[in-house]
A protein has these predicted regions:
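N-terminal pre-transmembrane cytosolic regions of membrane proteins
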Residues: 1-140
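Extended alpha-helical interaction modules
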Residues: 92, 102-257
Length: 261
């Protein structure tokens, strides 16, 4: 993967990259994905595990596996996958959050988002909640049907977002609305993808929703601080104007105290 952005021809036509650009872009492809044959139902949770919660969650997952005779994650593992009966669990630990992604059995002819996500999420109760939940996604992979256009009725029309893959092999939709059960619903219509490609797309869709939520986490605090910041900016402007007009030492000292208080 090139770290350069070319804007024309020649050796001097590349934009200077940020020193962390390659690392950030590589993160998207650093985690291996698993093949997902359609149809499939994926329930994805992201929890705030800052501080001591991260280590505690790892310890309880190890104990969870050991008590069931399953091979636990290694101490250095950041990604882990295990099978519980017919359910697949994928666990990922990041710097500030941890995800539990459950792929649960689904009937071939099951209607979209049926049965309910809450009834399928019972396996999440088998492990101790690692921290406050930030993200809960109900992603349903369905195979193309004759009445494909009917999916629009599953979502709020005022916020419905729909996209199609470049070759038309997949269509995905969401309205970003939280259901009464607390989930964001994403529908992925498979029009002939391989299980590997479906798995890759599932991971990217879950990443988009997870990081979209995390990116907005600081917004309430920004709103709370906005009046104080506006007041500080106003006072800074006033002091700057006084500095331009003042030649008195005592007055200058007073303004310095105001700036550094």
């Amino acid at each position: 993967m090139s770290n350069l952005v070319m804007v024309g021809g020649g050796n001097d036509s590349a934009l200077a990259p940020h020193p962390l650009r390659a690392t950030i872009l590589g993160e998207v492809h650093a985690r291996p994905f698993s093949a997902v044959p359609a149809p499939a139902r994926i329930l994805h949770f992201a929890f705030d595990t800052q501080g001591d919660r991260s280590a505690a969650d790892r310890e309880q997952l190890i104990a969870f596996c050991q008590t069931r005779g399953l091979v636990p994650p290694l101490p250095q593992d950041k990604h882990f996958r295990v099978t519980l009966g017919g359910t697949q669990l994928r666990w990922e630990q990041h710097s500030e959050f941890t995800t539990y992604t459950w792929e649960v059995p689904v009937e071939d002819k099951a209607s979209a988002f049926h049965p309910s996500a809450s009834s399928l999420a019972i396996p999440m109760r088998l492990v101790r909640q690692p921290g406050p939940v930030l993200v809960a996604v109900d992603l349903h992979v369905v195979q193309q049907s004759q009445n494909e256009s009917g999916f629009v009725n599953l979502f709020d029309q005022t916020s419905l977002a729909v996209a199609e893959s470049g070759d038309g092999a997949a269509l995905y939709a969401t309205d970003f609305k939280v259901t009464p059960e607390g989930f964001i619903r994403i529908l992925l219509i498979d029009r002939g993808m391989s299980p590997n490609r479906t798995g890759s797309m599932v991971q990217h869709l879950l990443d988009i929703e997870t990081y979209r939520t995390l990116a907005l986490l600081g917004l309430p605090e920004a709103h709370r601080l906005a009046p104080s910041i506006s007041l500080a900016e106003k006072r800074l402007g006033e002091v700057t104007q006084r500095m331009r007009r003042s030649d008195d030492l005592d007055d200058n000292n007073q303004m310095l105290n105001e700036l550094t208080a």
